[in-house]
UniProtKB/Swiss-Prot annotation:
Coiled coil: none annotated. It is an enzyme of class 4 (lyase). The keyword Iron-sulfur does not apply. It comes from the Bacteria. GO terms for cellular component: cytoplasm. GO terms for molecular function: ferrochelatase activity; metal ion binding. Gene3D superfamilies: 3.40.50.1400. HAMAP family: Ferrochelatase. Catalyzes the ferrous insertion into protoporphyrin IX. PANTHER family: FERROCHELATASE (PTHR11108), FERROCHELATASE, MITOCHONDRIAL (PTHR11108:SF1). Belongs to the ferrochelatase family. It comes from Protochlamydia amoebophila (strain UWE25). This is Ferrochelatase.
Length: 347
């Protein structure tokens, strides 16, 4: 039997259930990651375990209860669907596994299943289109933590980012077909935020967050999360023929009092109303699966706030989830990153 290529799809993670104790456990694991809150170990542990989680887990539990479906966590449900559909189109030459950076199924479990399958190479595919140390970087670090214990380490391919890949862009544009773009006054491309400090930390040039430094990606800012977000938004807007003056890139999900990358989505909603833009369509291209940040934060909380302040409508473009166009995009991205042609792709 020919050895197969292993594909490990990795997303952020989800609590086992929306119950407070499970949310508590999830938040502790997530927020004590040194790449997520990059403070010295003791300070991070005290901040997370004694302040952030004890004060947030019950509120987060209530949000997860709104998000949860009869099938379970949407992030996990959609993830399993992506895994299943990708396996079907890739065929027996590949083994596709799903893992979560935090909680289950874990990265260690996914790697062990690939090891048992005796795969000759492994492709690590983080489900984060834009690179950030707190997401993709953390995934790669966790993968190496476990692989370094293996006697025989297979050929590894790490996919770092794909912010303007035609497949990703095409999939979001396919989702946008559900909406009549002509009825909206303005468009927001809302990405998950990061502390400014983390963005600067990855910069070796001293130019980070200076005027227009994120508008074009070059060798100096190739790993800049904010620059990659602008690149994603520009590609989607261009394909949908949304003009530059019709949209803004913004950032959501801020945690704590530290300055995060701006503009903040919540502030832009108020700015839209001040400019009489009352019908808004929001894209969230940092999230390929609908989750707490899209379904609850944008589609419920921001939409309610916008209407309360005098807006007419705020609609969210549905996530890619397990849409067939997205599955094909994943296949293409994998194909482009494999170190050699694969018979499955040459048919």
């Amino acid at each position: 039997m020919n050895q197969r290529t292993g594909i490990l799809l990795v997303n952020l993670g989800t609590p086992k259930t929306p119950r407070p104790k499970d949310v508590y456990r999830y938040l502790n694991e997530f927020l004590t990651d040194g790449r997520v809150i990059d403070l010295p170990w003791l300070k991070r542990q005290l901040l997370v375990r004694c302040i952030i989680v004890p004060f947030r887990y019950k509120q987060s539990s209530m949000l997860y209860q709104k998000l949860w479906t009869a099938e379970g966590s949407p992030l996990l449900v959609h993830g399993i669907a992506v895994q299943t559909k990708l396996q079907m189109i890739l065929g027996e030459s590949f083994q596709v596994e799903l893992a979560m950076r935090y909680q289950n199924p874990s990265i260690e479990e996914g790697l062990e299943r690939l090891k048992l399958a005796n795969v000759k190479e492994i492709v690590i595919f983080p489900l984060f289109p834009q690179y950030a140390s707190a997401t993709t970087g953390s995934v790669h670090q966790e993968v190496m933590k476990h692989l370094q214990q293996w006697q025989n380490i297979p050929t590894l391919t790490f996919i770092n980012s794909y912010p303007d890949h035609p497949g990703l862009v095409g999939a979001f544009c396919e989702r946008a077909k559900q909406y009549d773009l002509s009825i909206y006054d303005y468009f927001l491309f809302s990405f998950h935020g990061l502390p400014e400090r983390q963005i600067r930390k990855g910069d070796s040039t001293g130019k980070c967050l200076t005027e227009n430094c994120c508008q074009v990606i070059c060798s100096d800012n190739a790993f800049c999360y904010k620059a990659q977000c602008y690149r994603t938004a520009k590609a989607i807007a261009s394909k949908l023929r949304i003009k530059l003056e019709q949209y803004t890139v913004c950032f959501q999900s801020r945690l704590g009092k530290e300055t995060w990358i701006q503009p903040y989505t919540s502030d832009l909603l108020k700015d839209c109303l001040a400019k009489n833009r009352k019908k808004i369509l929001v894209f969230c291209p940092a999230f390929v699966c609908d989750c707490l940040e899209t379904t609850c934060e944008v589609s419920i909380e921001y939409a309610e706030e916008f209407k309360h302040l005098g807006g007419d409508t705020l609609h969210l473009v549905e996530g890619l989830n397990s849409h067939p166009v997205w599955i094909e995009a994943i296949k293409t991205i994998i194909q482009e990153h494999l170190p050699h042609p694969h018979s499955q792709f040459s048919r």
